Amino acid sequence: MGLTPMMRQYLEVKESCKDCILFFRLGDFYEMFFEDAKVASKELELVLTGRDCGLEERAPMCGIPYHAANTYIGRLVSAGYKIAICEQLEDPSASKGIVKRGIIKIITPGTYTDSSFLEENKNNYIMSFYLDDNMCSMSFADISTGEFNSTHSNFKEAVVLDEISKFAPREIVLEENIKESFIHTIKERFPNISISKIKEENFDYNIDNNLREQFNNFSENEYETIVKKSANGLLYYIFHTQKNILSNINKIDYYSIVDYLTIDVNSRRNLEITENLREKIKKGSLLWVLDKTNTAMGGRQLRRWIEQPLINKTPIENRLNAVEELLNNISLQEDLKEDLKSIYDIERIVGKVASKSVNAKELISLKCSIGKVPYIKKYLSSFKSDLFLNMEQCIDTLEDIHKLLDKALLDNPSLSVKEGNIIKEGFNEEVDSLREAKSNGKKWIASLEQKEKEETGIKSLKVSYNKVFGYFIEITKANLNLVPEGRYIRKQTLSNAERYITPELKEMEEKILGAEEKLIDIEYKLFTEIRDFIEENIDRMQKTARIISDIDCLCSLATVALENNYIKPNINAKDEILIEEGRHPVVEKVIPKGEFISNDSLIDTKENQLILITGPNMAGKSTYMRQVALITIMAQIGSFVPAKEANISICDKIFTRIGASDDLAAGKSTFMVEMWEVSNILKNATSKSLVLLDEVGRGTSTYDGLSIAWSVIEYICNNKNLRCKTLFATHYHELTKLEDNIKGVKNYSVSVSELENEIVFLRKIIRGGADQSYGIEVAKLAGLPSPVINRAKEILQHIEGDKEENSLNITPSKEYKSKDYIEVSKDTLNTKNNLESEIKHDTLSETNTATIIEDESIKEHLCSNKKQIQCKKNNEKSIKKELAVDSFQINFEHIKKDKVIEEIKNIDILNMTPMEGFNKLYDIINKTKDID
């Protein structure tokens, strides 16, 4: 048995889009077959059926109504699938054989433009990447808005990952032979990004002609060849999927990576620039605080400003001056914001114009939006700052487009452009004439109905219409005896009625339907002419849209500054960051008003180059460091900042090493990740950079960690090519001695108050180093059981008392019912490597529940002494010969509620924001109140 003609056609089409789910149009449905059907039925929760196709077994099949396709397509694209739309290319009724079909569009995560599935305040970027020896280029496009950006640099994975993190593309287009290890790295860091591959030749083919035809501002001698390749590859992919050239992509914007403040992937995450650390949502981020925009365009632009802070003093100060002028003209600012609220998403509407998918209602939204532009231009003329004056000169009021739309389109047109009811009366004589004929015909129908009711005496008689039978007279069966014989021609019999026609009725039907059909055709033709005129002027509307989005951003920054009592920072060239009474912009928004403790900061490249911060955990060191970085970023985007006074030097890069989770899947421990991040910072930071280092060396033994932290500080301060402004938080109090030995190191600590054996974190950063870490007190605040806290204090006293003796003796408390006795003789301990070769490993008792204590002071002694470790157990048959070098174990059988302890052990505090830490602490305290 051979394949059916339809199935043969399906397989031929499928061959050209193997990586897509094929939506194959059959009548009023899109059908999917074979593996596509299995995937779609699972993802969309559709019933999987079968169809005879000429093979031995029925082909798996499922389908969806074509008019509801957008919803299903959106769900599949959101899940990362590509969809190929195969349409009927001819009228089935006019086709003698099998209907001609072809793919009209391929929808991918990076080329999807349905506004119902796009975030209005976030771009939907697609990226291309091209690698040539040691150089690479990247291009980013959003086909829904028409943006197209390109850059190039020396190839470093870190640089590429930073740009991916900045633009957050939904899809990346790569050359098909690129190394799989590089693709693996991308997928590992960004698992939700879709990867697509094209041939090498698609990056090169007809490169200059393609770019010249697409971009109004393209000059072949202006761009490096490698830049043109990534741009050409991306244009090829867009054309391949959209099946036409998009006129809204008409300008290529080249940017240099070094023209903006570099914030690497880890720093964007740690500083919570656009999403919070834990939930990966906007709330709790810097963007969340600063975004008071009134338009979708402004929301996207503000995100770009925050993702790409400036490093040139003049544009920064231009923005700051504009924000200041808005704050000095509150009434004018409010009028401006009120008009902004009435502006729709101009960029995405004209994007739909370019893709021929715009409807009449969206053009009415466009009309209403550009109708506000003359008022905005008038407001701009009232300002004096350079930025606003330039905007006032450049903004196009688009009055000709507004006039056309206002004259041509009904205020409330049909949603579908192929159903008529679009064109306004008086715009076209033929439309008016046909509408009159249609109206007169319907009046005739109404008069016919009244006449028949009167002449037959049937009050329930109706003249109705449907698409199958046209116009007809309907009479219920109860009244059939009243119908005069021979008056009507029977057309259809229903269960409770009869339907009739008359020659006169059918004649009028032809006139009415002819007028309606012709009217719909003419209205659609006029609509396409209007759409084409708008398409010819897309670049004008895009320029105006960009100015409106900039105005919206400035108004947003002014609103936030007013609401939160921000001040205008001074931008200096002294390599000095001086902040008086600075506040963390996010934390102060999520705690009760007035409770945030402000702090001063002074960092430069001379006497105050490295600020060494000591103090207990949870006291606010990390919050303070993040606060300095966020204030710097805010200043460089042109925002006012949360402080009493701020003098900010422009930074070229911001690096952070704050917390890390074990990357076990990649075979990297916390310490390995930490060292990799520190290495990256030391290799790439400059004297213009701001570096935040938190607890460097914490992931290894005390002496190793202390040595590494010490060496890092020396390298930063003594390397003439580095000397970056640095905030360095540590629990190694020994490092405070470096202030006397290394120029530029200054000791600071978090103030703590002790009252009746209780500690209170004052959150105030003060001059001088801390003399202790208060680790046990922090554990007590976290809700650890009293026996654990008391025993820890005993152990600490032993350790501190034995510091000047030759041995460390710790006898376990009897209340733990432990038989272990641990004696560590300081004179006989060897180094960690020697110990590991001398001690045979065994297992600890499996009958007891063990809790690991990793006290750094204990580990210090265990790793540095040079004698044999002896573990004696009174009730055991043999002496255990294994003792972990980096920790020792104590049994806690008496603790009944070990689930709470297990929860404490599993807290990933390194990846918590300060506010999340406080909430977790409160939760643990409540859970442990009943534990003795």
From Swiss-Prot:
Binding site for ATP: 615-622
Transmembrane spans: none
Highest rank taxon of the organism: Bacteria
Biological process (GO), any one: mismatch repair
Keyword terms: ATP-binding, DNA damage, DNA repair, DNA-binding, Nucleotide-binding
Gene3D superfamilies: 1.10.1420.10, DNA repair protein MutS, domain I (3.40.1170.10), MutS, connector domain (3.30.420.110), P-loop containing nucleotide triphosphate hydrolases (3.40.50.300)
Alphabetized GO MF terms: ATP binding; ATP-dependent DNA damage sensor activity; damaged DNA binding; mismatched DNA binding
Name of one Pfam family that matches: MutS_V
InterPro entries, per the entry: DNA_mismatch_repair_MutS, DNA_mismatch_repair_MutS-lik_N, DNA_mismatch_repair_MutS/MSH, DNA_mismatch_repair_MutS_C, DNA_mismatch_repair_MutS_clamp, DNA_mismatch_repair_MutS_core, DNA_mismatch_repair_MutS_N, DNA_mismatch_repair_MutS_sf
GO CC field: cytosol
Protein purpose: This protein is involved in the repair of mismatches in DNA. It is possible that it carries out the mismatch recognition step. This protein has a weak ATPase activity.
Family stated for the protein in its record: Belongs to the DNA mismatch repair MutS family.
The protein's name in its UniProt record: DNA mismatch repair protein MutS
Organism: Clostridium botulinum (strain Loch Maree / Type A3)
Gene: mutS
